[in-house]
A protein has these predicted regions:
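Positively charged, phosphate-engaging catalytic surfaces used for nucleic-acid and nucleotide handling
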Residues: 1-96
Length: 96
């Protein structure tokens, strides 16, 4: 399962738990991944689509992207999901 599939699955789970629509939850994930963590999601997805081209042309870049991929693997998706769920739970508690 690649990063996109894991991210999509995680977003669907969070959307079901929170009752929010998929697009809203995905935009929250994208914001967390892109702005707060400094991880460029577009580079992650590009890495998975064009690995062969990078290997031929830019071996140092692929090493950097591979390290980024390993660091931000499932553990990072879980952390982002938990953060979004915590925020959602706090909003519910404030309403009560």
């Amino acid at each position: 399962m690649n990063f996109r599939q894991r991210a999509t699955e995680t977003v669907h789970i969070v959307a079901r738990i929170t009752g929010k629509d998929y697009g809203h939850v995905w935009s929250m994930f994208y914001y967390e991944l892109q702005t707060r963590s400094g991880i460029d999601l577009n580079l992650m997805l590009l890495r998975e689509r064009r690995t062969a081209q990078f290997l031929k042309k830019r071996k140092s870049e692929i090493r950097k992207l591979t390290m980024l991929y390993v660091i931000s693997n499932d553990t990072y998706l879980t952390m982002v999901a938990n953060k979004i769920l915590d925020t959602w739970a706090m909003k519910l508690l404030i309403k009560i």
